[in-house]
Amino acid sequence: MSERLKILNNIRTLRAQARECTLETLEEMLEKLEVVVNERREEDSQAQAEIEERTRKLQQYREMLIADGIDPNELLQTMAANKAAGKAKRARRPAKYQYKDENGELKTWTGQGRTPAVIKKAIEEQGKSLDDFLL
């Protein structure tokens, strides 16, 4: 809570601040505060109505499923199984290029991601092309 809201929430501080204001100013502030409170009540009641409507619809669909002989838990299990089956890992890409690194070891590269420094250096400085490194 911000400091300003803490001041509004403390009766002693409000009384001290109110002594410095005219009655007209205090009444104007009260009207504005009432408008804000009413707006907030309206928002809360609208949100509650939306929740109740959603709950009513969910209950209606549940009853329709039961009337058709479908157990809602069975439907959820089927949905979860389909979701799990759809998340298969993709196959590893086969190597497309072969090169020797700084240590003289033979390495491969799929062509995905950053170009290895050895290949990049050979292309830029020695005038080679990627085709020279094909497997």
From Swiss-Prot:
RNA-binding is among the record's keywords: no
Domain of life: Bacteria
Record GO terms (molecular function): bent DNA binding; DNA-binding transcription repressor activity; minor groove of adenine-thymine-rich DNA binding; protein dimerization activity; structural constituent of chromatin; transcription cis-regulatory region binding
Keyword rRNA processing: no
A GO CC term assigned to this protein in UniProt: nucleoid
Locations listed in the record: Cytoplasm, Nucleoid
Keywords: Cytoplasm, DNA-binding, Repressor, Transcription, Transcription regulation
Principal location class: cytoplasm
DNA-binding region location: 112-117
InterPro entries, A to Z: H-NS-like_N (IPR054180), H-NS_C_dom (IPR027444), H-NS_C_dom_sf (IPR037150), Histone_HNS (IPR001801), Histone_HNS_N (IPR027454)
Function comment: A DNA-binding protein implicated in transcriptional repression and chromosome organization and compaction. Binds nucleation sites in AT-rich DNA and bridges them, forming higher-order nucleoprotein complexes and condensing the chromosome. As many horizontally transferred genes are AT-rich, it plays a central role in silencing foreign genes. A subset of genes are repressed by H-NS in association with other proteins.
Similarity annotation: Belongs to the histone-like protein H-NS family.
Assembly notes: Homodimer that oligomerizes on DNA into higher-order complexes that form bridges between disparate regions of DNA compacting it. Interacts with Hha and other similar proteins.
The name this protein goes by in its record: DNA-binding protein H-NS
